[in-house]
Regions:
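Metal-dependent nuclease catalytic cores that hydrolyze phosphodiester bonds in DNA/RNA
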Residues: 1-59, 68-70, 74-81, 114-118, ...
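Metal-dependent nuclease catalytic regions and adjoining charged, substrate-binding loops involved
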Residues: 89-241
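Activation of the activation-loop gatekeeper triad in protein kinase-fold domains
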Residues: 64-65
């Protein structure tokens, strides 16, 4: 039986409220909150598209995201995949070309004092997303259908489920930071302990190594079925998974 703490739903509710506000600002050439459907290899594919801007030479597909500064600073392939599926749906169902994709990111933890290289310049940011070819989109959708079919078969036959990739789990590797005693920022951040020890020797006295454990952010904070997942349980127990 699945359980979810209601406090975990705060940002989802906030995101829904933001969508409602933005919907009221639509123009005549805007299509807001439209769900499109198509069938591929016997599977039903659908997507609720936040905004379509219809222009003479094509459609711009946009999606609103209430997200973190970290997510904006680090490319999320999930966003690219999602919007390209939307583009495929638009071109398949409407037979009109898609000319562009973008994310409108509402950054909930934006702070002026955190400004640094690559940090979002404002709490609202538009991010252009790469538009794949129609063939690339079709191949990706068929690949995902195949993965879902394999997982469904594994469940029905009581077999092990396919494991998620590091990208799918939003995995952050373990890091070793070389810091000065009493300092706040790291002088060096290393991917191996060996490299960190070398940097520590060069740094001289009054420096130390801070171990920063790795994390699978999506599993830890967003997956509602992690308690039933063998891969997560192995990882959480310190085993390789």
């Amino acid at each position: 039986e699945l359980e979810q703490d209601v406090s975990d739903m705060v940002w989802a509710i906030f995101g829904t409220a933001i969508h409602a506000v933005l919907e009221h600002g639509k123009n005549d050439n805007h299509i807001v909150e439209e769900r499109l459907h198509a069938v591929v290899d016997g599977w039903s594919i659908s997507g609720a598209i936040d905004l379509q801007v219809v222009e003479d030479d094509g459609i711009i597909v946009s999606d609103y995201k209430t997200t973190s500064a970290w997510a904006v600073m680090n490319e999320k392939i999930d966003w690219e995949q999602q919007l390209n599926i939307y583009a495929w749906l638009v071109e398949t169902v409407k037979q009109k070309p898609v000319k562009g994709l973008n994310i409108v990111a509402i950054i909930r933890d934006w702070s002026r004092k955190d400004m640094r290289e690559n940090y979002p310049v404002a709490p609202l940011q538009e991010i252009n997303i790469k538009l794949w070819s129609y063939r690339e989109r079709t191949d990706f959708i068929r690949d995902r259908i195949s993965a879902h079919a394999a997982a469904l078969f594994a469940v029905e036959t009581n077999d092990d489920l396919p494991e998620c990739t590091p990208e799918q789990t939003w995995e952050k590797p373990m890091m070793w930071a070389v810091k000065k005693v009493g300092g706040v920022r790291a002088k060096n951040v290393c991917y191996t302990e060996e490299e960190a020890n070398e940097k520590l020797e060069l740094a001289g006295k009054n420096h130390f190594i801070e171990v920063r454990p790795g994390e699978r952010t999506r599993c830890a904070n967003y997956c509602q079925v992690k308690d039933f997942c063998g891969q997560w349980n192995k990882y959480n127990a310190g085993e390789t998974a």
